[in-house]
């Protein structure tokens, strides 16, 4: 599986001229990369693709497994200073780690990831998104800006397609822009769709202790995970023009990681 994923990726990179050999690692990308030295592991964080659980896993790898994954709060895992970003090291070390460590990134169907981001960030009450971002969206699309009605999926999509891809929030920025897989040669290209298999493969590759399992914790446990059916329900709210525009926005993600726009 890995070989075919890597082959597809490499040929799409070439065909679309996405390789920038010899250029300096983009600091935005270095910010998305987490380093775990004990097992020489680098993980690229793609939000909405099981990243909280990968961060929990890195935390456990570092801490000799003396805690349970379920004890690590969602909020804490994203604000801990114990998990180091590649960006916090000088460029020479960044290079060294990138050449010697096992590098991993996970992807998810672009439409499913988009719906998951909308459900998680705009339908829940995380103040930055449900207030700040939501108000920015309301201001763009509503005549009556005082209305406190939740931002609709259509408004959310219009908001995203109105911006340049590079400037998008990491929760909905195209995955290839977050992790630069054409220049960083990931050793494992995992998929959310085959998360169990792929995470076992990663843990074996980095020689993790056998007792460590990738956790399947979920932040809002009462809700269904965003799956294909839920994604379709949301996509049906969009016009064909909007769908064409999000296809275009995530076009490289579809090609590089071999997802179909079904």
Locate each region found by the language model.
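Membrane-interface amphipathic segments in extracytoplasmic regions
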Residues: 1-262
């Amino acid at each position: 599986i890995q070989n075919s994923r890597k082959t597809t990726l490499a040929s799409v990179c070439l065909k679309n001229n996405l390789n920038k050999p010899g250029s300096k690692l983009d600091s935005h990308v270095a910010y998305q990369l987490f380093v775990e030295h004990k097992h020489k592991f680098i993980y690229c964080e793609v939000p909405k693709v099981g990243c909280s659980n990968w961060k929990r896993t890195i935390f456990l790898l570092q801490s000799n497994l003396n805690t349970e994954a379920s004890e690590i709060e969602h909020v804490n895992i994203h604000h801990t200073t114990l998990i180091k970003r590649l960006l916090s090291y000088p460029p020479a070390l960044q290079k060294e780690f990138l050449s010697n460590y096992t590098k991993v990134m996970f992807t998810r169907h672009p439409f499913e990831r988009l719906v998951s981001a909308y459900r998680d960030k705009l339908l829940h009450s995380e103040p930055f998104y449900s207030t700040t971002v939501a108000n920015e969206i309301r201001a763009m699309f509503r005549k009556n800006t005082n209305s406190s009605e939740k931002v609709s999926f259509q408004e959310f999509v219009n908001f995203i397609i109105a911006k340049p891809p590079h400037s998008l929030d990491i929760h909905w920025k195209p995955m290839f822009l977050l992790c630069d897989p054409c220049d960083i040669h990931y050793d494992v290209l995992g998929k959310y769709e085959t998360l169990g298999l792929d995470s076992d493969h990663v843990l074996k590759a980095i020689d993790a202790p056998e007792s460590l399992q990738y956790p399947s914790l979920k932040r809002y446990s009462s809700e269904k995970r965003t799956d294909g059916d839920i994604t379709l329900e949301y996509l049906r709210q969009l016009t064909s023009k909007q769908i064409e525009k999000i296809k275009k926005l995530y076009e490289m993600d579809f090609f590089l990681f071999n997802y179909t726009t079904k």
